[in-house]
């Protein structure tokens, strides 16, 4: 899980999800998991 000021999808399988006002990216590749800090 990477915490970054700006999150962007890295590949086609990355999905952008809003949870409790935070933007997250989930993907099949665990390295692509991100969350906005």
UniProtKB/Swiss-Prot annotation:
GO biological process, one term: translation
SUPFAM superfamilies: Ribosomal protein L36
Top-level division of the source organism's lineage: Bacteria
Any one GO cellular component localisation term in the record: cytoplasm
Pfam families found in the cross-reference section: Ribosomal_L36
UniProt keywords, alphabetically: Ribonucleoprotein, Ribosomal protein
Name assigned to this protein: Large ribosomal subunit protein bL36
MF terms (GO), sorted A to Z: structural constituent of ribosome
Family membership: Belongs to the bacterial ribosomal protein bL36 family.
């Amino acid at each position: 899980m990477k915490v970054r000021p700006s999150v962007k999808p890295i590949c086609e399988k990355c999905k952008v999800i809003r949870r409790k006002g935070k933007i997250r990216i989930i993907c099949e590749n665990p390295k692509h998991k991100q969350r906005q800090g």
